[in-house]
Amino acid sequence: MPLSAGSLRRRPKFAAPLLSPACLHRLSVPGEFAARLDDDDAAGVGEEEEEESGRRAAAVLVVGPLGKVWRVELRRSPAGDGEAWLGGGWSELAAAHGLGEGWGVVLRLERRGVASLRVFDPGFCLARFCTPHAGMRTKDRPRFIKLLQQEDLEKMKIPEKFVQQHLTETYTNNHQNAIIVCPLGKFWRVELQREQPDVLLRDGWAPFLAAHDLSEGNILLFRYEGNMVFTVEVFLQNGCLKEYKTAALYLTDGTEGPSNAPQQSAAKVGVSPVKRKRTRRIEGTCLEGPNRKSRASPISVKVEPHKKHVSIVSQNSFTKEMTAYSIHSLLSVRGTFCSQIGLLEACAITLKISMKKKGSWRVAFKTANTYGYINGPGWRKFCLENELEVQRR
């Protein structure tokens, strides 16, 4: 199911999945990340100290997992070799959060001179420094970080602690599928396999790595959305977030990767009158969303000529009979379908009639307890301009 997406603007990030003892006192960061983090207007250390050390230093602010702001020195080598590191103040921050050898950190640039910090424990899971009260929703969804090793290229073990905390109730079969949504814009179905006591990403995993040019040394950051849906961020071997400027999104039904056959790969919503004098097929339903606060992905739609169709409808599709309420108020979408394609929270969605045409309609997608729905002026405009009528399917 092709998904149309524009530029993916993500905040720069740096990942260090396995800290050494030296990293607890001085954390090396890539020069490109340091260049974006460095605030030229921020107050640095004294000029005399700079001259004595032979290195330029700037003060940056690091927001810890509990919200406390730490002042840390960012030092860069004057030799222009790209060497940079977090120095003064970093060791105090690390000690305050109990960081040790084998822990991991991810820094995200919030703006010039300011970065936020996430910490991962030796079990590779997002560290929780406080337990939310019962009934309270935490901002951070469960995450785990993975530095790819040679043995992970054919099958990858999900951290045991993560399985125990988040997957035990959901993962009930020895063979069950997970959906991985990656920054490249593809939805991949990968088989989960139980090999006591481990849970492995197996069938479909190697094609996923190959399609995204991932190998030993790459870093993956998984975020669990629920219902066996994971989003993943990809980092280069130097720890910098891999940036994708364009995306063509697909929903794969097997381990062979995206299918080239539109009849099998595209989700279809049939729209036709009761007497079936005319049929319109809306294909390629896909999801595009903004960055963090509404992390979703675009819905692209393709209308085929008015002729009879004999095709295989993908599992990830649905058919709706249009009513006056669905046209003028809202169109409901099954909760299982939303979960299946990664629509998990309110976002803006782009509807397209054809991937080859420029026309598109921006509509609002929202969630209720057991279903999702599309509504608002954008949806009504889409119905009007595409002549959707009552009792069409």
UniProtKB/Swiss-Prot annotation:
Note the DNA-binding span(s) on this chain: 27-123, 141-238, 316-393
**In which domain of life is the source organism classified?**
Eukaryota
Keywords on this record?
A: DNA-binding, Nucleus, Repeat, Transcription, Transcription regulation
The answer to keyword DNA-binding applying to this record is yes
Q: Where in the cell is it found?
A: Nucleus
Keyword presence, Transcription: yes
**Name used for this protein in its record:** Putative B3 domain-containing protein Os06g0632500
